[in-house]
A protein has these predicted regions:
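Beta-propeller-forming repeat regions
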Residues: 1-272
Length: 272
């Protein structure tokens, strides 16, 4: 992360005719400090590879040009040049991104966090539009829905942060912050899902530093004004990342947790 000039790499892996044999690694252009990537739906038939670096090129002390989040459009032959479009280049210390869908369009929007706050990045008429939603430095972020149908944003703040907050919109559409947790170290994951089957999403937040853990935050009213905190794990897993998914087909989201420092992979099965 400290080398903002020459670090990082992006490869597309092409399967051989026999996928059990060695795959071909195709190098793609990249920004330094590349950190997160995922496929994002751009229209009904197209998915782009979106890559987020930590810092802008040649940044020092988290200052300088903005970090370039790039969208790579795959050609029919992946060995040919990929069309690359800048998604967002105004944020600094940009740790994570989240593809979501806020409209009826097939296209997904991208939520991204930065030192400047949370951005909503939308692809419209062939170009990316960046809308600032908040102004608090943000590292991790996901979105969920409350029982009243209102959307909320769940965060770790700031980069590798020590606090977690939720944002809901007021009558004027402004995102209002409510801090729910603080005092942890190196927050590194957030996920939203209806783990409890209440008709409203809850969110989980995890961290890896000092006394690691995962907490479940549950809204106690339809508008998300009051939340309850429950402990899911403690020092047994230092959370690097996690993903909510229904692994056993019972209709209930489970949680897959990866611990880098604790060198383990843990599945929290939903037993409700």
């Amino acid at each position: 992360p400290s080398d903002t000039v020459n670090s990082g790499a992006v490869f597309y892996l092409k399967a051989s005719a026999d996928p059990t044999q060695k795959w071909e690694a195709i190098a793609l252009p990249h920004e330094p400090t590349v950190h997160r990537m995922q496929w994002v739906q751009i229209d009904a038939k197209r998915w782009d590879l979106v890559v987020q670096p930590l810092h802008g090129r040649a940044n020092k002390n988290n200052a300088g040009v903005g970090a370039k989040m790039l969208a790579y459009e795959k050609p029919a032959d992946p060995k040919l040049p990929w069309k690359i479009t800048v998604v967002n280049e105004v944020g600094h210390v940009t740790h994570n991104l989240h593809a979501t869908r806020w409209s009826a369009s097939p296209a997904q929007e991208i939520l991204s966090g930065s030192k400047e706050g949370i951005w909503l990045n939308s692809f419209k008429a062939g170009a990316w539009i960046n809308t600032a939603l908040t102004n608090v430095p943000t590292g991790e972020l996901r979105d969920g829905k409350l029982a009243n149908g209102q959307r909320f944003l769940a965060t770790v703040e700031p980069f590798h942060g020590t606090t977690s907050a939720v944002y809901t919109q007021d009558a004027e559409g402004k995102w209002v912050r409510q801090q729910l947790l603080d005092g942890f170290k190196e927050g590194h994951a957030v996920a939203c899902a209806d783990f409890l089957g209440t008709g409203s999403d809850q969110y989980v937040v995890g961290w890896r530093g000092a006394d690691p853990g995962i907490r479940l935050l549950t809204p106690l009213d339809a508008a998300g004004k009051t939340w309850r905190t429950s402990t899911l794990t403690t020092k047994e897993v230092a959370v690097e990342d996690f993903k909510a998914a229904d692994l056993d087909g019972d209709g209930k989201p489970d949680l897959v947790v990866a611990g880098r420092q604790t060198k383990n992979l843990v599945i929290l099965w939903n037993a409700r």
